[in-house]
Design a protein with these regions (language model features):
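Alpha-helical transmembrane segments of integral membrane proteins
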Residues: 21, 25, 29, 115-120, ...
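Interfacial helix-loop-helix junctions of multi-pass membrane proteins
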Residues: 139-146, 168-172, 207-233
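Membrane-interface loops
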Residues: 48-57, 107-197, 244-274
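Hydrophobic transmembrane alpha-helices
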Residues: 185-190, 230-238
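Membrane-interface capping segments at transmembrane-helix boundaries
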Residues: 2-10, 238-251
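Aromatic-anchored segments of alpha-helical transmembrane domains
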Residues: 35-39, 125-133, 203-216
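Hydrophobic alpha-helical transmembrane segments
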Residues: 89-104, 126, 177-182
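N-terminal transmembrane-helix/juxtamembrane module of multi-pass inner/ER membrane proteins
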Residues: 1-97
């Protein structure tokens, strides 16, 4: 099967045709997964009342934990036109464009590692779809809690990148803006050779985590949940990768083991003859 075989570049051979076939397969998997993700996420949009009630639960929990920082953070940012523009820019251009760029970089820089991060993204996306369907949450910008949508007030670029018809308005929990940027940051830090690449990997998820909160698109707990799901998905993808890489070695060791020698034939019995 092409999908099963396509997990490792070396399994496709060294010819240019084999490599093109590999990357066409990988591109098809990623594009297909994104289409399915947006399609299913849109279909699982919950009711406004349920989403608002769940959002209230999250805000109450944050208050009890003393981490309800969204109002103070946004007030600080909106009072500075420069900070607000930076936050909006990070939210708009720091998500899908960055994901595409990092995956493309991995495809060239470390093809075998590319599939690891791609699989982690697919696993976390599947978990997210289940949560979106069973626990819809309205973002702060849609509630009457004194927070404003800074992104759409100052720019319409985000609506071009993610048209409203493809967006589930009640998919605040978890935040994959923060989670998937964390995954891309981990990839840059672990796979990058240059210092500036690793620095970008460290700054990127922090900037996005702050951005999603100050733009009123997510709660702080959404960021925590997104990060936890992505880290768990990466751990699972790593475990599956290790098992797959060990399997050929185990088979080879069995094949190389010499077959046991046949048991020696029993010695012929002596026949005693009586002297004549």
């Amino acid at each position: 099967m092409a999908l099963a075989r396509g997990l490792r570049l070396e399994e496709w051979g060294d010819s240019a045709t084999s490599r093109r076939r590999f990357w066409l397969t990988q591109t098809g998997i990623v594009v297909g997964a994104i289409v399915v993700y947006f399609g299913v996420r849109t279909l699982t949009e919950g009711s406004p009342e349920t989403a608002a009630r769940h959002a209230g639960w999250i805000m109450d929990l944050e208050q009890r934990l003393g981490i309800d920082v969204e109002p103070a953070m946004q007030e600080y940012v909106v009072n500075s036109d420069g900070l607000a523009k930076v936050a909006n820019w990070v939210y708009i251009w720091g998500h899908w464009p960055v994901i595409v760029a990092v995956l493309a970089w991995l495809a060239v820089r470390a093809p075998d590692r590319f599939t690891l991060y791609r699989n982690a993204m697919l696993i976390s996306g599947l978990v997210g779809i289940v949560i979106f369907a069973t626990f819809p949450v309205a973002p702060p910008r849609l509630l009457d809690v004194g927070l404003i949508d800074t992104v759409t007030q100052q720019s319409h670029a985000y609506r071009v990148l993610q048209p409203p018809s493809l967006v589930n308005q009640y998919a605040a929990m978890p935040s994959f803006h923060a989670g998937w940027d964390l995954l891309m940051g981990i990839a840059l830090v672990r796979e990058g050779r240059r210092l500036w690449v690793r620095v970008v990997g460290l700054v990127l998820p922090v900037a996005m985590a702050l951005s999603v909160v100050v733009t009123a698109n997510h709660y702080l707990l959404d960021v925590v949940a997104g990060a936890a799901i992505v880290v768990g998905a990466l751990a699972l993808a790593t475990r599956l990768r290790e098992r797959r890489h060990r399997r050929p070695l185990v088979l080879a060791s069995h094949e190389a083991r010499p077959s046991p020698l046949p048991a020696p034939a029993p010695a012929p019995a002596l026949v005693q003859k009586q002297a004549s």
